[in-house]
Amino acid sequence: MNKPVEPNSFRTGPDEQGMFGIFGGRFVAETLMPLILELEEHWNAAKNDPAFKAELQQLGAHYTGRPSPLYFAERLTEHLGGAKVYFKREELNHTGSHKVNNCLGQILLAKRMGKTRIIAETGAGQHGVASATVAARFGLPCVVYMGATDVERQAPNVFRMRLLGAEVKPVTSGHGTLKDAMNEALRDWVTNVEDTYYLIGTAAGPHPYPELVRDFQSVIGQETKEQILAAEGRLPDMLVAAVGGGSNAIGLFHPFLDDKGVAMVGVEAGGKGLEGDEHCASLTAGSPGVLHGNRTYLLQDSDGQIKEGHSISAGLDYPGIGPEHSWLKEAGRVEYVPIMDHEALEAFQLLTRLEGIIPALEPSHALAEVIKRAPKMGKDQIIVMNLSGRGDKDIFAVAKHLKMDV
């Protein structure tokens, strides 16, 4: 296959139609189009408004706790015996993951648009918690759609959302996971267009969502760049991040995309293996199609029906991926690889015991890839991994797999 011509910059997308090459766009019902266009108009104004940026930065510093530290994992590095491993500690943010970066940005946008009701979808519950948190902070009612399967396996986060005043609506259609929750949220949005803002949790969906979520999450990569230069005097050799919908990964990668010496690896959920259907590796094992308003790589059958994926991690079991990742894969700029459930579980336990950090199962997938790569690299080389969430929410799932009592 001919390699596509490399663009002058990997950081200029999307175009005015919201396309990254052949991916992205806005494939939505006619009733939603005016809303999407209104959102785009407000987003274009907000991103060029110094007051908007200043308010977001102020909230980031005093509410979220930014900048998050860049931490040299000394004992893990020694254990692996190769490249130096650094973690971008997004799990130390308020609410315990990277999700709050995007939620604060979007709730400021919702306020700017005069919306008085927030809806969101959630898989692992981290985005639901972050949405409920910012809605409480700004005094807006919040409804969170969550697949019934996820409600069951993420009980602590469901309780948190309800404590924060959000209404959690379990979705029983389909397999009761993230895709179904997103479908339900889109239905709600169409019905309540006047007063409702849909706070999407990942860098997917119709344009301008992939762009605005990426921009709100890019604070991760911007800080990392400054921090690694301060720590090492140079850029890292490799960046590694888990990809579900892809927002933590694009947030880390985007500021580095034009730095040719920095390799990037996105880690997908390989589930129980790629042979069957029990995985969520849409870039490794999927094909392009349209879902939730954008064209991207999807897990689909020969008739274009969306398959239900599986991952031990509720945050990675989305059968699609943000369109910018699809484009970066085809452009050859980022490599995407799968990690199996059992590998993520092993990585989870290793980090807990070596560094005293309990990671979420999502970044445990990224860590499993770091564990494979670091020993093959020189001791003078540097890997930065996005530790995108903490593992409190996963202790019950992990205990079940390890056959331990909680």
Curated annotation (Swiss-Prot):
It is an enzyme of class 4 (lyase). It catalyses: (1S,2R)-1-C-(indol-3-yl)glycerol 3-phosphate + L-serine = D-glyceraldehyde 3-phosphate + L-tryptophan + H2O. PROSITE patterns: TRP_SYNTHASE_BETA. The gene is trpB. Tetramer of two alpha and two beta chains. Its EC number is 4.2.1.20. This is Tryptophan synthase beta chain. The lineage of its organism: Bacteria, Pseudomonadati, Pseudomonadota, Alphaproteobacteria, Hyphomicrobiales. Keywords: Amino-acid biosynthesis, Aromatic amino acid biosynthesis, Lyase, Pyridoxal phosphate, Tryptophan biosynthesis. It comes from Chelativorans sp. (strain BNC1). Pathway: Amino-acid biosynthesis; L-tryptophan biosynthesis; L-tryptophan from chorismate: step 5/5. Belongs to the TrpB family. InterPro entries: Trp_synth_b_CS, Trp_synth_beta, Trp_synth_beta/beta-like, TrpB-like_PALP, TrpB-like_PALP_sf.
